[in-house]
Amino acid sequence: STKRSNLETESNSLNSKLITLRANLSNYKEEGTTIEEDIRDMKAEISRLTAKGCKNNEEISTCGRKYNSGNVTITATGWSYPLNWGCVTSEYTGYNIREDWSGGGGHHGIDLDCVSEGTTAYPAANGVVARIVNYSSCGGNQVWVYHNVNGIPYTTVYLHLLRISVSVDQVVTPQTKIGEVGGYSTQSYDNCTTGAHLHFGMAYGHNAYNFNANSFNPRNIINFPALYYSGGGYFSR
């Protein structure tokens, strides 16, 4: 079937990436999900969409758009900050002083700080929750949201959450509580954080399972202030 063929292709690609990542593990640590988590969640997604009515001859992306959020088309015309207030302490692809990277590595988002643990995090635009990961070793509790802003599909991700307040397929707005910012109390399982902050990332398309390859600097779309440690100020909704 088309779905099974897609899954096998993705699994082969992810397994190949796993070999490469393990070979270079001493050089960097990738923030987000592990390859094993991606494969596990993709299989669960196939089962979930099949149970909702996706047919064997349908593309995963097509039937996903059809059945996610109860056939409701979620659109938006603009973006909001994912926190009511905060500052930027780490740039997209920049070295992150709050995360443990052995020798560096890519940073596929920006870090929003100057807030305390437990601060409410919000979606950056109207959308639907596409994926949730709990207790990942490098990213902790994570939420992916699919958007369609001005006719363009996007994915946003929110990492290092203390708690998650939404569920997969839930329709959200910029006023919906996604969860709470994590911090020192999440370090027991999240090896990539040393303090309270929200990692916020953006990518083109609906790519909860291939996010980093399609990611871009959130500053390209949302007007965040300069780095706090370089004299930048605060943002607020």
Where are these regions (language model features)?
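A generic structural motif
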Residues: 113, 146-148, 203-205
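Conserved beta-strand positions that form and line the central face of beta-propeller blades
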Residues: 111, 144, 157, 180, ...
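Acidic, glycine-rich catalytic/binding loops that coordinate metals and/or anionic ligands
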Residues: 72-79, 84, 167-174, 180, ...
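Zn2+-dependent peptidoglycan hydrolase active-site motif and core
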Residues: 105-107, 116, 123-165, 184-198
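Residue-level signal for well-ordered, solvent-exposed loop/turn and beta-edge residues enriched
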Residues: 128, 152, 170-171, 176
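Alpha-helical oligomerization segments with coiled-coil/rod-like character
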Residues: 1-71
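Surface-exposed, glycine-biased beta-strand/turn segments
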Residues: 54-141, 174, 229-237
